[in-house]
Amino acid sequence: LQLVFFDQEEQNLQGSLAFTLDPLNLDHLLGVIVLDMVGYRCDQPGCQAYPRGLPIAPPSDRGDFLAVVGTLEHPNLLNAFKASPLTYTLPVPFKGLLTPDVLRSDHAPFWFYGIDAVLVTDTGNLRNPHYHRPSDRSGTIDPVFFAEAAQTVVDALLALQF
């Protein structure tokens, strides 16, 4: 188990790209769980937007779930999250090439190297009005939702069978 923090995601995924370019980092790597924006919840109707071209129907117009995005080609990690009532799992075909909005985070370089990777997210700018703004501060994080997100990842890790 490695805990890795990637930098410069907003600058064309530079941190995760640099990591994947070193073959030693990928040797014996069984999977990657990327957490990106996991602490914002909104319960008001209409507060949740979705990217175009999703292969399945969105669950609701409320932002009270975690999206877990993975590929159809590598379902192991994605399946580990399905048991959680907090998650909405999104299997994406063709490594996201038909839905480029799902390629905006650090999981994407791993997909292109054929490594099972998932993005766990509150959907960022599709829900959070503070995303990348001066008002994006720790006080906007829902501490209960954030703790539930952390527990969801722990539960998924325990459910994994490699």
Task: List PLM regions with ranges.
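Active-site-adjacent substrate-binding region
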Residues: D43-F162
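Acidic/histidine-rich catalytic neighborhood of metal-dependent amide-processing enzymes
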Residues: L1-E73
